[in-house]
């Protein structure tokens, strides 16, 4: 078992590479794939999440496309729960419902299978990064529209300057963030 102490969190944070001017000039991109390449950091991340969320009565873990799958699916497996993917339109084969959300320039849409969540489900949402909160806001709306209860969301990285934390807290979500980075 590994605890969420400062040394462990430092290992995780230091494994995340910062790529300047990607995908456009002026952006400091936080590359979670470098964490995945580091067995020690990836395992520490998963161990912390398992320890935090075990025995809390969750019935499903929902992960958002695509990097949320990299943390959500193994977490669900370790917790003995089902994993539900939330995806871009046209990627899920069964009947879906969709939720539109605003981006900095334009909008996007997410979908979930209509039979993946029901009123008996207590759901944990996970994604790699919390920025503006739009993706998770749409994901939570999808889950709640299907009758699921969702009050917890976990992120490996948070960019608090972009306002996502406040946006999601206004939806009555308890947030866990393993690393914070300043800026965009």
Swiss-Prot record:
The keyword Transferase applies. It is found in: Cytoplasm. It holds the Pfam family Pribosyltran. Homodimer. Pathway: Purine metabolism; AMP biosynthesis via salvage pathway; AMP from adenine: step 1/1. GO terms for molecular function: adenine phosphoribosyltransferase activity. Signal peptide: none annotated. InterPro entries: Ade_phspho_trans, Adenine_PRTase, PRibTrfase_dom, PRTase-like. It catalyses: AMP + diphosphate = 5-phospho-alpha-D-ribose 1-diphosphate + adenine. GO terms for cellular component: cytosol. Keywords: Cytoplasm, Glycosyltransferase, Purine salvage, Transferase. The keyword NAD does not apply. It is an enzyme of class 2 (transferase). This is Adenine phosphoribosyltransferase. Catalyzes a salvage reaction resulting in the formation of AMP, that is energically less costly than de novo synthesis. Its EC number is 2.4.2.7. One of its GO terms (biological process) is purine ribonucleoside salvage. Belongs to the purine/pyrimidine phosphoribosyltransferase family.
